[in-house]
């Protein structure tokens, strides 16, 4: 009985160290869980994706091809916030990507396959070269990104991604926590140069320097985010 209880407690502790992104908050309007965000496979376990060649690295959908019930609307230049359940509990970078639904599709029907994704944000650590490396998103219960004001209006998938690097010193050790929100963007100028478009899977290799990474020792002096550079207006 004691052994069973101990195993259960360990499993619960493991789940608590993991996290999901279940809701959006736009202009103070908080969606319900998995209402504007496609429900992820880890909605219960909170566990990560670890295989960058898996289709799950795209949106981590529990039921691929099944959209979220609603599409959120945001003004170009506005901010989209994702809630984190319970919080970001591992060290690593936060990144956001967008992909525009082609003509004839909506954010609900668009699957985000192929070279359609462009990065709009990435962060990195401070304290490199010291024993006190910190990451901007650590401990956050919500994370936000500004939609480029020069983006073209239309329907998009917005992909939030946090890469946990605490076990990333071996291939397959990095943990990816991610989700895709369904958006309609209004009011953009359409002048954005999206630069390099990438696919998920395909954008990352398990041996990319920002994915296969020794966080603790020897103490790192640099960090290179995986994927393309973020776009800007």
Swiss-Prot record:
Sequence positions that bind O2: 166, 175
Alphabetical UniProt keywords: Carbohydrate metabolism, Cellulose degradation, Copper, Disulfide bond, Glycoprotein, Metal-binding, Monooxygenase, Oxidoreductase, Polysaccharide degradation, Secreted, Signal
Glycosylated residues in this chain: 132
Highest taxon above the source species: Eukaryota
Chief location: secreted
Top EC class, one word: oxidoreductase
Keyword Signal: yes
Biotechnology: applications noted: Lignocellulose is the most abundant polymeric composite on Earth and is a recalcitrant but promising renewable substrate for industrial biotechnology applications. Together with cellobiose dehydrogenases (CDHs) an enzymatic system capable of oxidative cellulose cleavage is formed, which increases the efficiency of cellulases and put LPMOs at focus of biofuel research.
Annotated signal sequence range: 1-17
Protein name as annotated: AA9 family lytic polysaccharide monooxygenase A
Highest classification ranks of the organism: Eukaryota, Fungi, Dikarya, Ascomycota, Pezizomycotina
């Amino acid at each position: 009985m004691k052994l069973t209880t101990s195993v259960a407690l360990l499993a619960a502790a493991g789940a608590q160290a993991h996290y999901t992104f279940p809701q959006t908050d736009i202009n103070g309007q908080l969606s319900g869980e998995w209402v504007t965000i496609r429900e992820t496979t880890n909605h219960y376990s909170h566990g990560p994706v670890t295989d960058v060649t898996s289709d799950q690295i795209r949106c981590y959908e529990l039921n691929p091809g099944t959209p979220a019930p609603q599409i959120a609307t945001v003004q170009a230049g506005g901010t989209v916030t994702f809630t984190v359940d319970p919080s970001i509990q591992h060290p690593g970078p936060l990144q956001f990507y967008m992909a525009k639904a082609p003509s004839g599709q909506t954010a609900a029907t668009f699957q985000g396959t192929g070279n359609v994704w462009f990065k709009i944000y990435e962060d990195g650590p401070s304290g490199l070269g010291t024993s006190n490396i910190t990451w901007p998103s650590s401990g956050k219960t919500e994370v936000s990104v500004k939609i480029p004001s020069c983006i073209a209006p239309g329907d998009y998938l917005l992909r939030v991604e946090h890469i946990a690097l605490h076990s990333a010193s071996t291939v397959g050790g990095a943990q990816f926590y991610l989700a895709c929100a369904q958006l309609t963007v209004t009011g953009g100028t359409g002048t954005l140069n999206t630069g390099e478009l990438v696919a998920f899977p395909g954008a990352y290799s398990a041996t990319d320097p920002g994915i296969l990474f020794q966080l603790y020792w020897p103490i790192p002096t640099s960090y290179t985010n995986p994927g393309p550079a973020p776009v800007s207006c």
